[in-house]
UniProtKB/Swiss-Prot annotation:
One of its GO terms (molecular function) is rRNA (guanine-N7-)-methyltransferase activity. This is Ribosomal RNA small subunit methyltransferase G. Specifically methylates the N7 position of a guanine in 16S rRNA. Its EC number is 2.1.1.-. It is found in: Cytoplasm. It is an enzyme of class 2 (transferase). GO terms for cellular component: cytosol. InterPro entries: rRNA_ssu_MeTfrase_G, SAM-dependent_MTases_sf. The keyword Secreted does not apply. The lineage of its organism: Bacteria, Thermotogati, Deinococcota, Deinococci, Thermales. S-adenosyl-L-methionine binds at G88, F93, D111, A112, T113, A139, E140, R158.
Amino acid sequence: MFHGKHPEGLSERGRALLLEGGKALGLDLKPHLEAFSRLYALLQEASGKVNLTALRGEEEVVVKHFLDSLTLLRLPLWQGPLRVLDLGTGAGFPGLPLKIVRPELELVLVDATRKKVAFVERAIEVLGLKGARALWGRAEVLAREAGHREAYDRAVARAVAPLCVLSELLLPFLEVGGAAVAMKGPRVEEELAPLPPALERLGGRLGEVLALQLPLSGEARHLVVLEKAAPTPPAYPRRPGVPERYPLC
């Protein structure tokens, strides 16, 4: 896909960190080094023009964007040509790293900021990621459209909103039998306690909650699985902004 050395991409140290972190996750990232290096270069190129991410240092990007995104693969949810939604993708995380390592996934990356969507579109094009597309819009609107409502096998969101809000935004996108993963930091217990009744209203239930450490940094992370057990009632999601202002729990 790429040829020759890209001096604007990952340094030798950055590549070594990525390989080491991947190994800690049980992943061989050597075949994907050039793609991650080019993605890093694209982030650096765009950072002066668009406020994509607060993380710009090489080690920060490798650990807190690339490897953090790939912690999703610790869950046994990604086998086969699944249709996956990345909600609130920002600069393409976790969706782009997930797609690089699992190219068979059909991926839709959604964000409500047009400039971020434009960046993700460019990254998809430059990296040659077939079966991936970026989409501008709000979850509350898209989840009511025929091509999106109950149309996905998996959905993911990283640091978008509290679980009570995320549940209402994610579950309507899932087919019955599908699963969403909310990527959370060290403190998740307070969000989990009131969640089950809200999930039941949405046709969901709480699945696995996987505690893990971010490779290289040791920071605590939690992957919260929300399972789609029944169709989501037509009333959900509510109008844009309402889930945040009046969460279900």
